[in-house]
């Protein structure tokens, strides 16, 4: 069986410089982060003694673009890495197997490069916009770009520059915690004896995207009130650290009267199942995603993970967390009883059964989507499959080069 290597490519508008990347997603393993490794192919006749530079940049947008007035900006762009690719500054650079294949296939005009993310760099997150909002979405985005210039500080002309948006993501740790998240609350009532107790227990601490979240609810009614109905939510909590803003959105919910009313002296034990999905929140403003909703493999943003000994308060960028919220309606005079149980929503780790199942599903979808796609072709000599990045070109691009 011959295994093909998928490689993503994108060229400048004038076609003189082309990026090749072996992947679009780069994983933070906590003790190290996958390097950004690829190859740049340049037409030597186009350079005319100029140089090719490449950058790894992050753009952190924490406010709406339409609110930027009087020179006030609600975004920060940081250049994380910058390197001269042509002529190559480091001729002894160690290449990955994919880079070796590409250089062998593409010839002497192919130049490898490798960038490294700084430690503790935030994960890619995009906050979903409203339907009529045409500005850039809030979130953290990583871009790798290459351009032709006499020096690295020269103006970057759009005609001779190519940029690609990549994602930095986190996977679930290889070992799961043994503790089952739980919460116990009780409520008494004025001018009435007794209490209603609510206990919620989850069957695990870490859930994977696309999986069921199981919450077992135990209700003991030792009061004179009755529970009318039960509401179950999965809440996504978002913190934008730059402006210290926090908000919460439900990403899955259900309401039921099954087993209700729970009358005085009665008990109820029931397990509820919810599946938080990005596809069920397409039109909801402010939902945090790990990319743009138009992407075929987009998920809800994963929970923010930090190294042992640190708290999420030390994290930068956009901090994401999740919880299961249970509400009991005790009538007009009784009010509500509410409790939250936190959990983590993450990508399955490589090599896990869940990850293999997820990869198999994505591969099937990819095969179907690319059967009739012109931007997809295979080179049998080196078992390389090339796929074009979506071309996002500005209509008023600078034509100077």
Curated annotation (Swiss-Prot):
One GO BP: signal transduction
PROSITE patterns (UniProt xref): ARRESTINS
GO CC field: cytoplasm
Domain of life, source organism: Eukaryota
Keywords annotated in UniProt: Phosphoprotein, Sensory transduction, Vision
Cross-referenced Pfam families: Arrestin_C (PF02752), Arrestin_N (PF00339)
InterPro entries documented for this protein: Arrestin (IPR000698), Arrestin-like_C (IPR014752), Arrestin-like_N (IPR011021), Arrestin_C-like (IPR011022), Arrestin_CS (IPR017864), Arrestin_N (IPR014753), Ig_E-set (IPR014756)
Disulfide bond entries: none
Keyword Magnesium found: no
Any GO molecular function: G protein-coupled receptor binding
Signal peptide: none
Entry function: Directly interacts with light-activated rhodopsin thereby activating the phosphorylation of metarhodopsin. Inhibits the dephosphorylation of metarhodopsin.
Family: Belongs to the arrestin family.
Name of the protein: Phosrestin-1
Source species taxonomy: Eukaryota, Metazoa, Ecdysozoa, Arthropoda, Hexapoda
